[in-house]
Design a protein with these regions (language model features):
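Short, solvent-exposed amphipathic alpha-helical segments in soluble enzyme
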Residues: 301, 376-379, 406
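Catalytic-core elements of nucleic-acid end-processing and repair enzymes
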Residues: 429
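N-terminal localization/anchoring segments of enzymes in phospholipid and broader phosphate metabolism
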Residues: 1-347, 351, 355, 395, ...
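Thr-Gly-centered strand-to-loop micro-motif
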Residues: 362-364, 421, 440-441
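Helical hairpin unit composed of two closely spaced alpha helices linked by a short loop
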Residues: 366-387, 392, 397-399
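Surface segments flanking catalytic/ligand-binding clefts of nucleic-acid enzymes
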Residues: 417
C-alpha cells in the first residue's frame, strides 16, 4: 500500500496533475463563455483565422505548421487559445531572449582562425562551404586537435576517470541525464577529490532529464565541497512551450584542453552496468587541443544564460597546450538550439546526405525524419549512394519504434538499407560519409532533437579517426539484422494502425 501511495504522490505525478488542472480550467472557461455568449464564439473563429494566416506564413518547419493547423481545425474553440497561451508566455520570451543575448555577447570570442579556414578551402571547396555556414553561426573550424573515438560508453568512462583525476584548473560538466549508481558515484568521488585540491568544478544538468538532484542530498554535498551546480530550465508544471526545450547535450571539459562529447549520459545503462534494453551500444569522442575551446564556450553560454549581465573571465578557460601530434584533419564542434532559424543539426545532416558520392552510414536510436531529411535520404539512395541506417532492435520507447516503421517502408522502397541492432539498444548518433567526413554528437533523427532541444556535435573531416568510426559501424552492422520490404508488409494490421495514428503526433515525439 505504501508503494502505491508513493507512486501516486511522487513528483512526476504531481506535475502531471497540476498540468491537467490547468488544461481543464482552460477548457471549462472556454466552454462556459461559448455557451453564454455567441459573440465569443465568433471572436474565437476570427482569432483562429488570423492564427492560421500567421502560422502559414511563419518560418517554422512545415511539419510543425501542419500539426498546429490540424489542432486549430479539429478543436476550433480550444486550439487557437492553446497556441496563444503556449507561445506568448512571458517566461518563454525571456528564455529565448537570454539565450540570444548570450550568443551575441560571446560571438567575438569564437572568431575564425584564418589559417585553418584557408587550409580547408584549399583541401575541399564543398566541405569549406559547409564549414563556412557553421562559422557564420558562431562555431569556427580548427586544426591542431587530436580525436579519440570510443565505440562503447564503458570505454569512454574509463578514459574520463583517468583524465578527471589529472584535472588542474577546472572541470565543466553538462549532461541531460544524471542518475544514481556506480557510474555517478565514481564520477562524484573524483569531482569531490579534485574540488578539495582547488580545481574549479561546475556541473549543469537538465531540469527534466535529471530530477533526483532536487530530492536527494547531492546539492548539499556539492555545496560542502565547493562544487557549483546549476539546473538548466527547471521543469515546472506550467503550460509553456519552453518546457519542451531541454538541454540534451553531453559535455565534459577538463582544463580547457580536453573535451568529451557523444551519446552517453551519466547513468549505469550507458556503461552496461545496468541492463534495460539488452546491450547498450553508444559512442563518444574525446578532443584534445584547439577545438576544445568551442565546447568550453558552449558550456559557459548556457551556464550564464540566466545571468546575462555576469562578467565572466572567459579567457582564463582557453586551452593551455596544443598536442604535438594529431591524427590530422579539421575539427568543428557546433551547438544547436530551439531558437528560430537555428537549425544547424538539420542543415549539417542534409548537407552530408545531399553531397555524398559513395556512401552515407548512419547510427540513430530514433528514426523519425522530417520531410526534408526523408527526401534527401531517398534521393541519395536513388542516385546510387549506399545509404545504410542502424536503429535499435530493442527500443526504449515503443511508440518511437512504431513510428520508425513508417519511415522504414518508404526508405526501403528507394533503396536505403536498414538494420536493427539485434543485441539490444543503439543510442549512438553518428554519420560517416565517403571515408572523409563524419559527425558524432547528441543529435537524433527525430523532431525533438532536431528542432526543440539544445544539442551539440562535432564535424570531422580528413581525420584518421574516421576509419576507426567506419570499422566500428561495419562491426555493428554485422551484429544487426536487415529489415526488408517483406517485413514491412507482414506487420500486423494493428501495428500499422498504431504507426499511422502516431504519425499525426510525430513532431511531438
Amino acid at each position: 500500500m505504501k508503494k502505491i501511495w508513493k507512486h501516486l504522490f511522487n513528483q512526476n505525478m504531481l506535475y502531471i496533475l497540476l498540468m491537467l488542472v490547468q488544461i481543464a480550467f482552460l477548457v471549462l472557461s472556454v466552454l462556459f463563455l461559448n455557451r453564454n455568449y455567441a459573440w465569443v464564439y465568433g471572436a474565437l473563429l476570427l482569432l483562429n483565422g488570423l492564427l492560421i494566416i500567421y502560422i502559414t506564413n511563419s518560418r517554422k518547419n512545415p511539419t510543425y505548421k501542419n500539426a498546429w493547423l490540424v489542432v486549430i481545425a479539429v478543436l476550433p474553440i480550444f486550439g487557437g487559445l492553446s497556441y496563444l497561451f503556449l507561445k506568448t508566455r512571458r517566461d518563454t520570451r525571456i528564455f529565448f531572449h537570454n539565450y540570444k543575448q548570450q550568443m551575441e555577447q560571446t560571438k567575438p570570442l569564437l572568431t575564425q582562425e584564418p589559417d585553418a579556414a584557408r587550409h580547408l578551402f584549399n583541401d575541399s571547396q564543398q566541405v569549406y562551404n559547409l564549414s563556412t555556414y557553421l562559422q557564420h553561426t558562431g562555431f569556427p573550424v580548427y586544426e591542431q586537435t587530436n580525436v579519440t573515438y570510443f565505440p562503447l560508453g564503458e570505454e569512454q568512462f574509463a578514459e574520463m576517470k583517468n583524465r578527471l583525476r589529472e584535472a588542474k584548473r577546472f572541470i565543466f560538466i553538462e549532461y541531460f541525464i544524471i542518475a544514481p549508481g556506480k557510474m555517478w558515484n565514481e564520477f562524484l568521488e573524483i569531482l569531490i577529490e579534485r574540488a578539495r585540491a582547488g580545481v574549479e568544478v561546475r556541473l549543469m544538468y537538465d531540469g527534466f532529464g535529471t530530477k533526483f538532484f532536487s530530492t536527494g542530498d547531492f546539492l548539499k554535498i556539492a555545496k560542502q565541497h565547493h562544487i557549483q551546480c546549476q539546473c538548466f530550465n527547471p521543469f515546472r508544471p506550467l503550460l509553456s512551450s519552453a518546457q519542451n526545450n531541454r538541454d540534451h547535450r553531453k559535455i565534459l571539459v577538463i582544463d580547457g584542453n580536453i573535451a568529451f562529447n557523444g551519446g552517453t549520459n551519466l547513468a549505469d545503462e550507458y556503461i552496461n552496468e545496468k541492463v534495460r534494453f539488452g546491450h547498450w551500444k553508444d559512442t563518444a569522442i574525446m578532443l584534445e587541443g584547439a577545438a576544445v575551446w568551442s565546447y568550453t564556450m558552449m558550456f559557459l553560454q548556457l551556464w550564464n544564460m540566466n545571468n546575462p549581465n555576469k562578467k565572466e573571465a572567459y579567457d582564463q578557460y582557453r586551452p593551455t597546450y596544443l598536442p604535438k601530434q594529431t591524427n590530422g584533419g579539421f575539427i568543428q564542434p557546433y551547438g544547436d538550439s530551439p531558437v528560430q532559424d537555428d537549425v544547424k543539426g538539420v542543415m549539417v545532416y542534409l548537407d552530408l546526405i545531399s553531397n555524398a558520392k559513395r556512401y552515407v552510414y548512419i547510427e540513430t536510436p530514433y528514426l523519425i525524419p522530417d520531410h526534408d531529411l526523408l527526401t534527401a535520404l531517398k534521393l541519395a539512395a536513388e542516385k546510387g549512394v549506399d545509404v545504410r541506417i542502424i536503429t535499435p532492435h530493442i527500443p526504449d520507447k515503443w511508440y518511437v519504434y512504431q513510428l520508425a516503421w513508417n519511415a522504414y517502408q518508404e526508405l526501403l522502397e528507394s533503396g536505403v538499407k536498414i538494420f536493427e541492432y539485434t543485441p539490444g539498444f543503439i543510442h549512438a548518433k553518428s554519420f560517416v560519409v565517403d571515408d572523409e567526413l563524419a559527425v558524432l554528437g547528441t543529435i537524433n533523427l527525430d523532431y525533438r532533437s532536431l528542432y526543440l532541444h539544445f544539442e551539440c556535435a562535432t564535424l570531422i573531416y580528413h581525420c584518421n579517426v574516421i576509419q576507426t568510426m567506419l570499422a566500428d559501424f561495419l562491426k555493428t552492422q554485422r551484429k544487426s539484422q536487415p529489415i526488408t520490404l517483406e517485413d514491412c508488409k507482414n506487420r500486423k494490421w494493428y501495428q500499422k494502425c498504431n504507426s499511422y495514428v502516431l504519425g499525426l503526433l510525430a513532431p511531438l515525439l
